[in-house]
């Protein structure tokens, strides 16, 4: 997933930006791999697509989501709504996220995750 300089210091899919949450690189990599395995890009989105969405995800202690992800940021694109829905669907399908360590719950209970097809699809 990727880092966004404008995010509120929460880890994103691929890297962390800021210092609020400090997931290990192995946790980030495992989260990225898990979500990528559940994600089906919408029609018209590929590795060269220059669009992304950021979703805020709240987790319960069992590493499942406590509610539906909320769209925080998106590039202006006609494909944006479809990308946001596909990202939400991937998160719903992938839970629980057992790679997130219970002892670090305070660090991952509230994350903003960036879905960037260029990074998810290796563009």
Provide a role label for each language-model segment:
Residues 21-29, 78-85:
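Soluble non-cytosolic domains of exported or imported proteins
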